[in-house]
């Protein structure tokens, strides 16, 4: 297994924070990525301009991801 795969595997089922280029933020459990680099999250909450909403399962295309961090 290569270093990138090891790192990605260590993030599975962890809580992550993703910000996309339109300034929305998503916090959810990281499930996987697809071949195009999209992040798939479950139990996700979206935060936008002071409001939040529960979304559940979401797919965030990699080309829209501004930042990705694993929460402690």
UniProtKB/Swiss-Prot annotation:
Ranges of residues in domain Sm: 3-72
Gene3D superfamilies the UniProt entry points to: 2.30.30.100
Protein function: Component of the NatC N-terminal acetyltransferase, which associates with the ribosome to acetylate nascent protein chains in a cotranslational manner. NatC acetylates protein N-termini starting with methionine, followed by a hydrophobic or amphipathic amino acid, with amino acids at positions 3 and 4 also contributing to NatC recognition. The first 4 amino acids of cognate substrates are recognized at the Naa30-Naa35 interface. NatC-dependent acetylation targets various substrate proteins to specific subcellular sites.
TM stretches of this protein: none
SMART domains reported in the protein's UniProt record: Sm
Quaternary structure (record): Component of the N-terminal acetyltransferase C (NatC) complex, composed of the catalytic subunit Naa30, a large auxiliary subunit Naa35 and a small auxiliary subunit Naa38.
Main subcellular location: endoplasmic reticulum
Domain of life: Eukaryota
Protein's name according to its UniProt entry: N-alpha-acetyltransferase 38, NatC auxiliary subunit
UniProt-annotated location(s): Endoplasmic reticulum
Gene Ontology cellular component list: endoplasmic reticulum; membrane; NatC complex
Organism: Schizosaccharomyces pombe (strain 972 / ATCC 24843)
GO molecular function list: RNA binding
GO biological processes: protein maturation
Keywords: Endoplasmic reticulum
């Amino acid at each position: 297994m290569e270093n990138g795969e090891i790192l990605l595997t260590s993030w599975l089922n962890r809580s992550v924070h993703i910000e996309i280029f339109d300034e929305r933020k998503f916090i959810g459990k990281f499930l996987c990525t697809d071949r195009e680099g999209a992040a798939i999250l479950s139990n996700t909450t979206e935060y936008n301009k002071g409001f939040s909403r529960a979304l559940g399962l979401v797919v965030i295309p990699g080309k829209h991801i501004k930042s990705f961090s694993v929460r402690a």
